[in-house]
Amino acid sequence: LTILIGINDTWRRFDSNVISKPEDFKACYKRILDKTLEKLSPTLVLMDPFVLPVPEDRRMWREDLDARINIVRELAKEYKAFYVPLDGLFHQAAATTPYEYWCPDGVHPTLAGHGLIAKAWLETVLGK
């Protein structure tokens, strides 16, 4: 079971002033994981939310998103899940290629962005 959540909480803060506290995000994420594990025995793959600075105002999203990324990292350890560090991977990829190539709005991946995610997932989970 692969989970990638968190960026919409950040987005709502900046477009609608709907604030989701990091501790609430963590509690909700843990409920999702716990309820899933009560019913199933999946291999868990947690991917951190990400944002690229496109448009430029996305830079200020870091103040909200970084806490969520840290929470996902902590939960991956706590639940012994595979962890795919998408935020770092996208920023690393964007060091040599324009941000828009990966995510034209900083959040929603292009075909190339989806390819980056798929490659990272395969390398993390299957070692390929």
Where are these regions (language model features)?
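Alpha-helical cap/lid subdomain in secreted, periplasmic
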Residues: 1-128
